[in-house]
């Protein structure tokens, strides 16, 4: 991983257009070719990014950029779309690279991991006709618990929690924003699945067009035998 702290401006073009004016920022270049732009705030969410597959090309600035004090231009081009991230670097304050090796991945809570495995096996709980695409679908900001397709062929991203709160909805929102940039996946529906969903989280999810799904852990494990109940 390469970490560069630099005074830079950033422009994103493609399905979306965004501009970040000149400021000091952290640029992350990961081994999977993804590039993320961070500020000293906003928690762990980048200001902008380009997810893989993409290529990074470093070039000398043209005369106009030189006149504005630009010393180096990074062009990050997505391999599957016209999305492009252009970083104009004025000053580099720090530049270091580190080999992090192979990461073992996130070790999820035992119940959450089991819920994910059970939902992948019982994908029709999302709705009739849904099919599993992949568990732990990789993105530049972490793996999506489950990626599926609806009967209509639309992409469905599922975030699974034992107890669903606002942080879980925010996490899913970031995944949806990122996945929605990929023309092969867009549009992407979101499903927030948990054993228990807090009222505030449900309201936030519904406001963002995210469907909520309450998971019955015992029933999914086959422990809730309705025919054997006395009441």
Swiss-Prot record:
Family classification: Belongs to the NucS endonuclease family.
InterPro entries: Endonuclease_NucS, NucS_C, NucS_N, NucS_N_sf, tRNA_endonuc-like_dom_sf
UniProt GO cellular component terms: cytoplasm
Cellular localisation: Cytoplasm
Classification via Pfam families: NucS_C, NucS_N
Entry function: Cleaves both 3' and 5' ssDNA extremities of branched DNA structures.
UniProt cross-references to PANTHER family, sorted A to Z: ENDONUCLEASE NUCS
Protein name per Swiss-Prot or TrEMBL: Endonuclease NucS
Keyword terms, alphabetized: Cytoplasm, DNA-binding, Endonuclease, Hydrolase, Nuclease
Gene: nucS
A GO molecular-function annotation: DNA binding
DNA-binding among keywords: yes
EC number: 3.1.-.-
Keyword Nucleus: no
């Amino acid at each position: 991983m390469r970490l560069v702290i630099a005074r830079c401006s950033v422009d994103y073009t493609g399905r979306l257009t965004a501009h970040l004016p000149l400021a000091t920022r952290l640029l992350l270049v990961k081994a999977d070719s993804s590039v993320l732009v961070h500020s000293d705030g906003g928690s762990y969410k980048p200001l902008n990014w380009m997810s893989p597959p993409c290529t990074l090309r470093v070039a000398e600035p043209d005369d106009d950029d030189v006149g504005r004090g630009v010393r180096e231009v990074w062009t990050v081009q997505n391999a599957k779309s016209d999305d492009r991230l252009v970083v104009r670097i004025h000053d580099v304050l720090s530049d270091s690279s580190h080999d992090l090796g192979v990461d073992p991945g996130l070790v999820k809570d035992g119940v959450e991991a089991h819920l994910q495995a059970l939902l992948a096996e019982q994908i029709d709980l999302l709705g009739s006709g849904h099919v599993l695409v992949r568990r732990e679908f990789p993105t530049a900001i972490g793996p999506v618990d489950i990626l599926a397709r609806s009967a209509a062929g639309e992409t469905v991203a599922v975030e699974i929690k034992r107890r669903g709160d606002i942080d879980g909805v925010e996490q899913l929102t970031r995944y949806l924003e990122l996945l929605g940039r990929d023309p092969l996946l867009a549009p992407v529906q979101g499903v927030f699945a948990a054993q228990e969903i807090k009222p505030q989280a449900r309201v936030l999810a519904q406001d963002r067009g995210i469907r909520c799904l309450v998971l019955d852990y015992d029933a999914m494990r086959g422990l809730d035998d309705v025919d054997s109940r006395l009441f």
